[in-house]
Structures are given as structure tokens and as C-alpha cells.
Amino acid sequence: MLRGQSLPWRAALHQTPRPTVLRPLLPFARNNGPVRSNLSISRLSRSPSLSPRAFSTSSIRRKEKPPSDEKEDSNLQEQKDPNEQKDSDRSPEGRRRSPDSTGREPGAPTSASGRRRDKVAGEKEQRGVEEDAKKENVSIEGKSDPTEDPSPIPVNGGGSSDTKSSASNGGNEDGGRKGKKGSGDRALQKPSVPEVYPQVMAIPIAKRPLFPGFYKAITIRDPNVATAIQEMMKRGQPYVGAFLFKDENADGDVIENLDDVYDVGVFAQITAAYPLRGEASGVTAVLYPHRRIKISSLLPPGEQSKAGNTEDKAPEKKGDVVASFEEGVAEPAPKDLYEPTSFLRKYPVSLVNVENLAEEPFDKKSAIIRAVTSEIVNVCKEIASLNPLFRDQISAFYTDQFPGNLSDEPAKLADFAAAVSAGELHEMQEVLEIMNIEERLPKALVVLKKELMNAQLQSKISKDVEAKIQKRQREYWLMEQMKGIKRELGIESDGKDKLVEKFKEKASKLAMPDAVKKVFDEEINKLAHLEPAASEFNVTRNYLDWLTQIPWGQKSVENFGIKHAMTVLDEDHYGLKDVKDRILEFIAVGKLRGTVEGKILCLVGPPGVGKTSIGKSIARALNRQYYRFSVGGLTDVAEIKGHRRTYVGALPGRIIQALKKCQTENPLILIDEVDKIGRGHQGDPSSALLELLDPEQNSSFLDHYMDVPVDLSKVLFVCTANVTDTIPRPLLDRMELIELSGYVADEKMAIAERYLAPAARELTGLKDVDVNLQKDAIEELIKSYARESGVRNLKKQIEKVYRKAAFKIVQDLGEEVLGEDKALTDEGKAAQEESKKETEEGDPKDPPADPEKSTTETPRLALKVPESVHLSIGKDSLTDYLGPPVFTADRLYDTFPPGVTMGLAWTSMGGAALYVESILENALTPESRPGIDITGNLQPVMKESTQIAYSFAKSVLAKQFPENKFFEKAKLHMHCPEGAVPKDGPSAGITMATSLLSLALDHPLDPTIAMTGELTVTGKVLRIGGLREKTVAARRAGAKKIIFPADNMSDWLELPENIKDGIEGHAVSWYSEVFNILFAELDKDAANKLWQKQLAGKPKKGPLEEDD
């Protein structure tokens, strides 16, 4: 079926069919030689009454004659009057004869002999064209023409529903049933189409225009237009004009305004009309276009005007040619214009005055025309190879439209290309309007190319869909066959069904969110349709396993008891007041609200103060599950966010693994060493922690492997770090910092007695043995072996003491008391005998024959030490267990010489004493040049503090001691001991300035005074950090006084009394206060005149002066 046509047009195809001669479609090559086509040919019946006619008017006639058959002429002459025969031979209607010379009615069945006669008639018809072209060279003006007859033109068999002849020749409306062979007169009757029809009823059409020679079925719903069509059919004048709407969405059967439609359309014949189903007034009309026409004026519906009115004139386009292009023919005087549609004035329909459009003359041998024609034929072949229906259309079109050579009908070929294509509205209309064949053919080729692309796309989609359907049908068929075979053989299933049921059972016990439930259902359906041998099966199974092991909606019952939490925390840790207070606050809030949200805490402190171990105690106090993982040195983001499932061996991140292990949504997760996280080519894990540790985001944490949101808002995160300098600022901002300072000697003593010593005794097997580590020994151990702020090294030293004691006990008692045979059980003795036997049979140098048996741990019993054993470890015997003390002295100097001061520093190990030494490199002389050298592995900030202190010291000496010229001539050297330890920070400013002034004033300082504070060039003392650690270091170094900035007074007040015990604190704001404390006993007059003797000598003479 042609595009845009409906079922009724098939009936019109068989109105008055004629047998045609089948010819192959012949494309043309560049040498103009015919090439045989492989395109298949199918037969098509086409009514000769509906074939396109040559254009003419009342005063102009075409020069060409249609082909005629000699036999037909002779037959007609026998049946007609000679005069009539003479006139009819000259008229175009008389020359158009039916090629059927057998006398049978068109549409009757054709026998084999009839088909042979058809072939002979076709050959004669082609020869007749050539003879007529030679003979017919005279004008036909003045001859009789049916179109000049003012009476209505009858249409016999042209679609009239009430003519008797239409029923006899198969031209009725029932779809063209073949009628019986009628009489010879009736067989020779044929309808005629007027070449001039100045006024027609205009019917607007939508979507695509009509092209001459191609049927189109349209639907008429306007009752007036439907009634007019029926009237036209009854009168035998079923001719209308079809014009395309400019608006694709427009609808209607009447043209209200000439601007609504294109002015170029087609003159069409209504071959059949059928009433619409379900509608009383509507009809479906089948139109057959004959030629192109152009609107000259519009008579709006209901207007009673004559056809001569020229209102709403349509603009005339360039290239529009009216009537024939024959030259040298004189036009007769105009006659009164016949109006065949005058009976339609009573209906409110659209009447238009039209004029015929004729094609411009063209050269059939033009290279452009031949090339484009050949390309159109090639494209048609390609489309035909993809679409069988299009192949039938091409065959029917060639059989019907091309009785001669294909190159002789390029205009029809262009119309065919546009008629069967699905182009744009304006493109199709352009093909209809263009009268120049060389311009029309490329336009039609473009439209046909688009149809080729559509056909290719449809073919591809059809093949893909068909392949998918076949694949699914094949899989389904095979699966059903396999199930049937297993069922017949009684073979059990592969376990997939049980696996699916297991996952569904697990999921039913979990409170999955809607988004997770949706993903679970999709994955379980995928698993059910996968074969166990498929690689995707294991991936899906592992994913479902992880998805069902996450504790969706499962929480542990928390304990909000304050007393219980205090008891648990004190059992495991001594001190750590800040941490314990924060956890108690957390519990109190949960007790009041009834629930608690997850928090992110960060414990910052030196090593060994209990940051990691306190996390486990917090989980026990809150009755939460505990999970710890370290991120120190971590460089792969996938450890936190997981791997994508596309990778082999992919796993979720550590957070999802923690939830799987804890089986609760509210565990305590300890992220250790967060300040030592790394960065590599696999990403920045610290940036991945931003989402994890953000309370606003972790409620929908997205792991790469799980790819579903996981709620972490109820998890209590505890991070640990030694320093905060290496933690990115955005990450640090998301955590609540709790600083843990180092332990003082008293705290270490309590920790050692309560926790470390009992644990070490049990670890070394001395739990039930009378081994006593005296208190003075622990004090000496803390003082001389473990000065660190933490207790990790102290724990090591205590364990070492007990190990030495265990060795001493075993050695003293001997093998007689603690024999090996007493330690073995019966199983152990049997294993020992078997091992000994195997050793004797084999070479002693050979490795064991059965490594698994030989390396298996032999069952043993713990030996009991006799109660008579007593061991006491005191201060004096500590060297026998631990060796010489590591720290031999608390301070470097018993008394300070001039230029030496004791400062205080903060390190990751806690606080430490920082000594600053300044000396005079050379003796002072008038020729001396000032300067200062700095050593001690000082970092940039501390070097700047040295320059500030040097400049400030010179300023103080110049103001308060103007006669002292020490800094003007002194070459100085400043050093900070322990040069292997890098030192940085601004807090040693007042210490350095004091060291320089002590040397310049030659005044030694009190060795029991320690100081810390940042100094500016104007003498202002600024705030410092780590006052607790520095105070502990000062106390350990034997300091009695400590000078610190006044801005740190609040930190000083918060220090425990056991730390401040025996130390006097002095808060200062300016260095003048520091000077008054340190140099209170200084003789200012003597200090002012100091160094005058050294600088008063005469300068040495130069070499020239000595010669004189």
C-alpha cells in the first residue's frame, strides 16, 4: 500500500483495468546504452480513463499525439461513421484508444492467447508512436474537440455510481470486480477527462500533497462537501482540485482563506466514494490526480459570484507555464468561459478558478537528467531490497507509467519518488510546484534518500528485534526442555532455587529501605534467570550476600547508666578526664532524649597515652559493638569507599565490612592514625573521609561496591591522631577535638601500680608467685628509663623486669623442681614419643617428614612455682634487670654560666626542657666586628625567632645600658643542644633574648627558672601551646619557677594540682616583666660600664705605620 493510502483505493485500481505489457526497469549508464535490470516485475492493472492527459486550452493544442494501434483504427472505422472517424482521429480523445484489440471488455479474465495478443498490441503501439511523430505535423486548430462542447461531459466508467456501463465493465465502487465480456460497442466506450476545467471544487488535504498518477484516499466529514461530492458523482463530473494545507496540524474540508493552502495542487478525479462507518454524513473518497493546476482566484463558501471574478488572486510563480509550449500558433478570440461547477453554488463549499500548469521543455539527453534519473533508480533498488512492499510498488509503477524507455519519462519518475517517500511537507510541495525537470529531479532525489535512510533504520530495528525475540524464545525453549528432562530423570536442581530462597529469607528479617529493597528485587530476579556457570552468577550472588549481611534496622540496646560508664572507664584507664567527661555528656544527652545520634570525636595526644585503648572502653561503657581499623599510610580510596563490582575480586570498603562484622547499625568505629593518612595515584583517602565523617552527609553514605545509600548517622566515630598539623583543614573541621596531654610522674606511678604491673605479672606467668616490684623501683624506672609522656615505654620496661624475674626463678629452682616431664600431658607425651621415634629412624639433618605433625603445638600444663619462692625488686637491683639508666641526669647544668637559659618545648612525645647556649667567639677588641652564628638543627620559624631575639637584645642594651657596647663588637654563637632533633616554633623567643642579655651583662641566671613565650621586636610576649606538657617537663627538670605568657593563664588554672605542686607560675605580658624577674639582683651601674676596658685600647697600627 502506498504511504498515506487506505484500503478503498484498491477498489479504484480495478475500476477499468487494462492489460499492460511488462517491461524491465532499464537504468541508463553514462554511454546512454541500455542495461538490463535485475529488479523483479509484478503486474499492475491501471484504468486508462485515469491516465494523465496532455495539457491544452480552448485556443492551444499539444503537438504530440498519443500512440494508436492500426488494428484499433480499422475496427473503429468499421463501427463509426467515416466523418466521425475523421474528426476523432485528429482530436486527442480520438487518438487515445484502448490497446485491447480483441474486442473483450477491460477487466475480463485474460487467457494465454489473449496475453500473446497483448504483447503484439504493445509492440504495435510503440511503433505507432514513431509513425505518428513523423506524420502528424499539422495544426489541429478548428477541429472538433469534446472539451469545447458547452454541454456537461459524461464520465463513462469514471467512477459514476449510477451509470449502467460502469457495472458492465467492472468500474463500480465495490473494488473492481471483473465483469463479464460485454458487447463490442460497450467495450469500445471509454471515459474522457477534460483538458480544460476552469472552475473546480477545492478540497484541502493535510500532511502530504497528491502527485499525478497516484491514488489517494481522503476522508470528508463536512456534510456539505460530502453532499456536493455525491451530486458530482451523479452528474458524471467527479472532478475536484486538491491543495495542501500549509499548516501540518490544520484540518477541514473547506478553504476559508487562500493563504491557508498552497496555490499549486492537482486536478483529481473521484474514482470511488464510500460512506464512513459510524457517521451519517461523512464519506471516504478515492482521488486519482491527473495534472498540476494553480489557483487563480477563490470563491469563498456561499458566495454567489461568477467564475470570471478574479478576487483573491494567487501570486504567480516564476516558471509557471499555462497550457502548451507550442510556438507559432495563433490564439483565437476568447469565448465565454464555461462553468461546469455552477450547480455547486448552492452548497457552502470552496470553489476556485484554476489554470493548468505545463512542464517546461527539457532535453531528454541532458547529462544532469540522465545522471539524476539513474541515481533515483539505484536508490529505488536499494529501498526495494530492504522493503518488499516498496518492491511491488516499483514494479506496478514501472508497468503502468513507463510504456516506453525510462529515460523518456523523468517527470513521472520524480513524481513517483516524491509520492512514495516520507519527506517534509515543504519538500514534497516543492517537488509538486517545480515545473523545471532538471530542478525537480534533485529535489525528488533528496526526498527519496531520506526514505532510504528510514528504510535502513526500520530494517535494522526489525532485525535487532527479531534477533532478540528469537534469542529469548530459544533460551526459554531450552530452559523448559532442560526442566522437563530433569523432571523426567528425577535429577535435583542445581541449588539456585534454594539460594534464591535463602536470600529472600534473610531479606525478610531485615528492615531494608525502599531504595535498597528495589535493588534487592532486581538483583534477585537477575540471579533467578542466570545460569550457575555464567560469570555474572557469582558476581550477583556475592553482591546479594553482602546486601543481606548489612544490619538494616538492627541496633544494639545502649546503656545510658552514668555510674556504669564511670566504673567501666575508670577500670581501664587512669586520668583522661577530658575524654571521660565527654563520654559522660554523650550518655547524659542520650538518657534525656531516649536516643543518641552518631558523633565524630578526635583524640589528639602523644603516643602511649591511651587514645586507642580508650575507644574500646567507651564501646563497653555504651554497650556498643567495637570495630577498629587504621588508616596510617593508606593511599587507596577503595579501602574506604570500596571497589566497583566490575573488577575481579571487588570488595566493599572498611565501613561496610565493619557493619557486617558488628551486625548493628550503631557500633563504635575507631579510625586510628588519621593524621598519618597517605595520598597516591589511586586517590586521596582523606578526601574520601569527608563524606564519611560529615554528620550532614553520612546518613546516605554510598559505597562503590554496594551502590546503595547506607545510613551511618547512628555510628559513633572515634579518630586518633598524634598531631593536627597533617590533618586537612576540611576534615579537621568535621571532628570534635579532645586533646590528651602526657602523664606526669604521679600519674605514671598510679598507672604502673594499678594496670601495668598486674598485667605484666599475668603475662609472664608470675600471677601466683610472690614477686614484688617496690614503689621506689617504679619511681626510679619512670625517672631514669621511661621519661616519655606516654606509658607505652613504661609498660615495656615493667614487662622486661618481670621476664627477667621469671628467668631468674626458673634458673634458680632448676630442672629438678620444674622438669619438662611434669609440664606435658598424656597427649603431649605421646606426641613427643612419636616425634622422637621418627627422628631416630631418619637422618637428623633431614627436615621433618611430616611438617604438620612436627610443628603442631604439643599440649602442655602450666607449672606451679613453690610457695617458698619470694622475690623483691628494689631501686638498687633495678640495674640488674634493665641495665644502666638511659637518662642519667635531670638537667644539663647544676649551675648556669652566663649565656645559658632553660626553655620549654612541646614534642609528640610530650614536653621537654630546651636549653639555649650563647658564647662569645672572640675576645672583644676595638677592631672586632659584630655577628651571630646559629646551630642546633633549627627550622625556619625558630631561626626567625633568633633574629628577633638578637635585635631585641641589642635594643634593650642600648636603652638601659647605653655605655655597654657589647653587641657592637661581639662575635656571638648561639646553640641549642641535641642537634639531631629538629626544632621549630616561636615559643623560644624570650628564652633566646634572655640568653643573649645574660651574656652581654655577664650575669648568670637561676637554674631553677624555666620559661616559654613568643617574643615580638617590641617586647610583647605572645600566647603559646602545650603548657601542660611544658609544665611537666619543667617539673621533671627540677624547675621551681616557670614564666609563661599571660594569655595562657586560663590553661595554667586548668592544670591539676599534682602537676603544679612545687612550681611557681609567673604570667607576663611584656619582656620587661621577664627582665625584672631574671635580673632582679643585677648591678646596673656595673653592667653599664662592663666591657669598657676591653674596648678602650688603641687600635693596632697597620703595616705602613709599623715601618715608620
Swiss-Prot record:
| Residue intervals of the Lon proteolytic domain | 895-1081
Q: Where is the composition biased (Low complexity)?
A: 36-53
Provide a GO CC annotation, any one: mitochondrial matrix
Q: What is the lineage of its organism?
A: Eukaryota, Fungi, Dikarya, Ascomycota, Pezizomycotina
Q: Which organism is it from?
A: Aspergillus fumigatus (strain ATCC MYA-4609 / CBS 101355 / FGSC A1100 / Af293)
Q: Where is this region: Disordered?
A: 24-192, 299-318, 821-862
Q: What is this protein called?
A: Lon protease homolog, mitochondrial
Gene3D superfamilies, A to Z? 1.10.8.60, 1.20.5.5270, 1.20.58.1480, 3.30.230.10, LON domain-like (2.30.130.40), P-loop containing nucleotide triphosphate hydrolases (3.40.50.300)
From the UniProt record, which GO molecular function terms apply?
ATP binding; ATP hydrolysis activity; ATP-dependent peptidase activity; sequence-specific DNA binding; serine-type endopeptidase activity; single-stranded DNA binding
Which PANTHER family does the entry link to?
Answer: LON PROTEASE, LON PROTEASE HOMOLOG, MITOCHONDRIAL
UniProt superkingdom:
Eukaryota
Q: Where is the composition biased (Polar residues)?
A: 161-171
The family line of this record is: Belongs to the peptidase S16 family.
Q: Which UniProt keywords apply?
A: ATP-binding, DNA-binding, Hydrolase, Mitochondrion, Nucleotide-binding, Protease, Serine protease, Transit peptide
- InterPro entries attached to this UniProt entry: AAA+_ATPase, ATPase_AAA_core, Lon_bac/euk-typ, Lon_lid, Lon_proteolytic, Lon_Prtase, Lon_prtase_N, Lon_prtase_N_sf
The annotated transit peptide is positioned at 1-62
Subunit composition and interactions: Homohexamer or homoheptamer. Organized in a ring with a central cavity.
Q: Top-level EC class, please?
A: hydrolase
Q: Name one Pfam family in it.
A: LON_substr_bdg
* Location of this chain's protein in the cell: Mitochondrion matrix
User: What residue stretches are annotated with the Lon N-terminal domain?
Assistant: 200-452
Active-site residues are 987, 1030
HAMAP family attached here?
lonm_euk
Q: According to its UniProt entry, what is the function of this protein?
A: ATP-dependent serine protease that mediates the selective degradation of misfolded, unassembled or oxidatively damaged polypeptides as well as certain short-lived regulatory proteins in the mitochondrial matrix. May also have a chaperone function in the assembly of inner membrane protein complexes. Participates in the regulation of mitochondrial gene expression and in the maintenance of the integrity of the mitochondrial genome. Binds to mitochondrial DNA in a site-specific manner.
